[in-house]
């Protein structure tokens, strides 16, 4: 019940708000999915992700990206790199970007600490993946032998449902309220389960914003977006299972050196202090298969849990934990919430996405792991 009311329900409410509001925004005009246009959309989303959340940026731009590539036969690689960059790595610069960083902010990490600390590792990942994507997309386009023609209608680019962008700002504000406002008022909804006022306020505001978007956005916009409830329902079902099954796994990790995973906890420390490269890899690998937010917290506390120390003399340790949690959320569909939502939206639009293990072994391991090795060698070795 504790996990359900205090973690799962707020999580789904946030996803519902972003999914509904972003579904009311439609990019109109003659946008054709060439390699440079696709890369531009992905990079715009990557930039936005740190400020409106990976989920918000992904939900805002996935449909325009798919629509721009309706003429293409093979766009799986486009969706995959969108997941890599927009749904994960792009959220590195602020606590608004990704849930693990927001938890760090609630624990006392400065709001802009990640902006400076994560900038260079993130930039390396973005530049490398952008170059790879451009040549890969160019290769697939050439292989398809499709002549990309400029549309005849010459319709200028525009945005329908623009008021929803204001609602997304409202979502960001509601999330920030729960982080900054501490009235120290809570309601006991069940024995030992307390709902804090700031979190209740956030969730109510998110539901109000969702209602406003659904009620006042012309339904034709959603129809043109091929909007359905299927992706959010599928994600709600999947993450219900994940939230239940991670409870024992996180409990074992929290047991530290006294638990069944004592080997992992021991591996990240030595007589000389934290072993940063191990913090990066263990946080990352576990974040790929568990929820990356509680995994971040476990290793944050393992490293001492003092934000002042972790931002000071142990700044590379905090960087390793942060980068591992955010970057490696891209390794699997369940590593970060928007991954599976993007997959579901793509599939509902007719794109044949790879299976769980197909994504892992064909895409994330070949393209991401070599870059993670380089990043870990540069910053944490």
Model-derived features: where do they sit?
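Interfacial loop-to-helix junctions that mark the boundaries of transmembrane helices
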Residues: 1-10, 111-121, 153-159, 184-204, ...
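Transmembrane alpha-helix boundary signature
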Residues: 1-3, 18-33, 47-60, 248-260, ...
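Hydrophobic core segments of alpha-helical transmembrane domains in multi-pass membrane transport
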Residues: 15-23, 45, 122-134, 164-179, ...
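Juxtamembrane interface elements at the cytosolic ends of transmembrane helices
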Residues: 20-24, 56, 60, 98-101, ...
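Helix-loop-helix module between adjacent transmembrane segments
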Residues: 22-29, 44-57, 86-94, 121-133, ...
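Membrane-interfacial helix-loop connectors
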Residues: 49, 59-74, 78-80, 86, ...
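Juxtamembrane and boundary regions of transmembrane helices in multi-pass small-molecule transporters
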Residues: 93, 112-159, 327-381
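Transmembrane helical segments that form the transport core of multi-pass membrane transport proteins
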Residues: 168-298
